[in-house]
Amino acid sequence: MVIASGAIDRRHLSPFTPTSDDSSSSFFSQDLVPTERQVGFWNSESMVDHKGSKSVFASPLEKIQPNGANHAGDPETPGGQAFKGLDILSLSNLMRQENASGSPSLSWGEILTNPISRLGLSTRETAFVEPTTADQHVPGYGKGLSSSSLSEVFSGKSREIVSGVLCQSTGTHTSIYDSDEPLESMEAIEAQTIGDLLPDDDDDLISGIADGFEFTGMSTNQDDADEDIFCTGGGMELENNDSVKGDKVQDGSFKSQISSGHSINKQPSRTLVVRNITANIEDSDLTVLFQQYGDIRMLYTSFKHHGFVTVSYYDIRAAQNAMRALHSKPLGLMKLDVQFSFPKENVPGKDIDKGMLVVSNIDSSISNDDLLQMLSVYGDVKEISSSPISCTKKFVEFYDVRAAEEALHDLNKGGISGPKFKVELSQHGEAGSCLRQQHSREWKQDSLPHQPKNSSPGTIGKLGTKCQDNSTVHNLFSPVNQQLESPTQCISTTGPQILSSPIRIKSTLQHNNQASVGDLSGPLGQGNFGRGIQTLHPRSLPEHHNRICNNSKSMTVSGRNASSRQDGVDHNIQKVGPAGFCGHSFDQNNEAFGFTEIGSCPLHGYHYTWNHTNVFPQSPSAPILWSNLQHPMHVHSYPGVPPHMLNTGSYPMDQHHLGSAPDNGGSFGNVHSFHPGSLGSIGLHGSPQLYPSELSAFASSRGNFREALFSPVGGGFQSLQQMCNAINGRNPMIHVSTSYDATNDRMRSRRHDGNPAQSENKRQFELDIDRIAKGEDSRTTLMIKNIPNKYNCKLLLAVIDENHRGTYDFIYLPIDFKNKCNVGYAFINMTDPQHIIPFYKTFNGKKWEKFNSEKVASLAYARIQGRSALIAHFQNSSLMNEDKWCRPMLFHKDGPNAGDQEPFPVGNNVRSRAGRNRSLISLDTKDASPSSSPDQESNSVGTANSTCRTTLEQT
């Protein structure tokens, strides 16, 4: 047996070096061996006949010397044989031979780590070569396959096998010669080889392989993941963890600087962390973007250069609506990632308690309905629950923290005649944990997809099997604590059970009776999952018309009279109903007590009765008990189904309310105090349910936030809600009385934001027909809200012209350029203030006839007033670069052409929309056609309408 072995000098060779011609000791002078980066098997083209082939399994970090690099006679190559690695195929044959001879089976790792003893070779048959200096400095790269460099040499009928095994401790190479054997079929050899190569230990399988790769983006500090407020995922990574960590050190702790100690949380809260924000976006644009969902309490943009900002709302519904509408929505080149931010445990004044009041010294004769009527004048009440400790104490939760503050100050001063109460802010721990559980469940269920069409708009989710039909709602659920064992019990599963959070709705819900709960004043929208609760007491959810709580045998909590002040308690809240219901009605919004700012009536039907709380059976008078929530049910809230957008107030930076159109930096925001009846029928006072799931964040401006100039703070809100409703085609809203009376007006006027200036600013956009009739209000520009999204300019003009042709000279229907639908509102300028009265009677509080829409139109004053001001505002707008059907329209207001369209004057400094991906297209630049020529602008309205329709069809 001839044995030759040699040590390899790997120091001076290029990745692929042909063997020298005078290398007589090399069997193949022109063979190349793969470089260190080629991991795995590498077969030459001559593999079929196994001549001149090399199969190499190389370590990622190991360099393999080309054959013939060392010449015969070289001190490092005794025997004149060039070093050759052990061929894998030959090794497999060798292993089978050894196994056939009765030797114990050998693993690949054993052969590599102890090749001589394992293979049964005697020391006299093996020549050892002292490692070279280069070899001595080669570190061990683990054990197993990846720590060896192997190759083979076939020559004629004989085969010389020289094995070089670089041991981790010695770096010694061993050469072994084995006699030739007939080769099996390639398939058999390959199968056997793979089996032999795989190590017994999984660690061996991957050891050494990952050593050759540098995972520079992977953080080695586990604390980074804990401190990263974006660890909840979603969106694009902003940067390397290392750089983020450095920024943290430089800018200070996120915990202390972001939202005053807020951190990412799956649970609904009033504060959101929005990531993937473009650093060059203006703060005013962000204000417009966020303000359309409600009054902004704080917009924190210090970390904008890191790609994220935090925004806090007064109303929790605004935060939830913003999250649903904006999460995963494109902003620039990235999609926004919106997450709830919740106060740290060590932060005083928990976010969840800010909207909750503790009302003490309540007479037993006062029901939840009575208390609801008393408190709803301050704002929308989300929940009324009984204290588990005292029957004379109740927790009252407002959607908006400002409503809670107003109620606190007013009630303690004797603001309500009759029984005297002691009112104080809830302290964290008293009801906070229960609220968080309820909010979490509510948000989770609210995130479910659309409710079935056959589901009642205001139906309440199915209750758990343990719910019992008690005489009063508060006893709706048995006090069994087992109910708490299943966080998802009593959660309606009417809608698809698609939850982002880990908690799923259990099958036990199937046993719940789905009796119709009646018409809740507001559509539950997508978020509405429940079908009904047969166990609810007939009087459980009274109707509140004109703020009068009428016990209804149906679960309808019809919204207060449309004219009732928007501040009113969410009718669903009224679910709190006569005795309140154990399944506390929770508006999607996390903070139970934040009332919706202006006219944002709690989401009717959205306040899901979350029956997870066990009601004290012993205290039937206690409608809603949080106390029995012994097991916090934290249902992680993820954005899912967009809820109706409750209009919440306007951002302090731009105090435009109800019907006011924000200026360039304004918001589309929430309309606050528009006429009480305007949205009453919608069930959301001042804020129709909005399903922003398909809402384009910048619908009215094609990405230019400032173009959304007209959406009143509250109006835009409503319009957005409307838009979403129409887009999603679901959740008809229960029509609520839209009568207007002075009583409701007075009730509405009692509510203010704590800031007299803000309250006055909101009221200034309300329509007062009496003042108009007396000539005391000469404003002429109106905002029409809650327009079905499928309406185009032709349909809208046709509806208006039925009775009001010639009474207006300007109209603008903002369009969402993404889906070619309107955004839910329009602006119209009447030629005379007196024309507003018949126009108001025709549209305000009335449903739209087309598309089976349940939306109810409402009117409010726009911020920009007058034809000339409107023209000045738009003539240099980027809208002038858009198709004409997307632009504002002017009409002749007198003369024989009264009512006919006239050209809209274009300014000399028309702005271009930044980031526009396509070339500007305007009918002015297109090939002239009868329907698109600029000359045709003076044609009749019918021609203009035809143009609108044609353009829509073409696009």
From Swiss-Prot:
CDD domains: RRM1_MEI2_like (cd12524), RRM2_MEI2_EAR1_like (cd12276), RRM3_MEI2_like (cd12531). GO terms for molecular function: RNA binding. Residues 935-955 have a biased composition (Polar residues). InterPro entries: MEI2-like_RRM1, MEI2-like_RRM3, Mei2-like_Rrm_C, Nucleotide-bd_a/b_plait_sf, RBD_domain_sf, RRM_dom. Residues 270-343, 355-428 form the RRM domain. GO terms for biological process: positive regulation of meiotic nuclear division. Residues 64-83, 436-465, 897-955 are annotated as: Disordered. Signal peptide: none annotated. It comes from the Eukaryota. Keywords: Repeat, RNA-binding. Probable RNA-binding protein that may play a role in growth regulation. This is Protein MEI2-like 3. The lineage of its organism: Eukaryota, Viridiplantae, Streptophyta, Embryophyta, Tracheophyta.
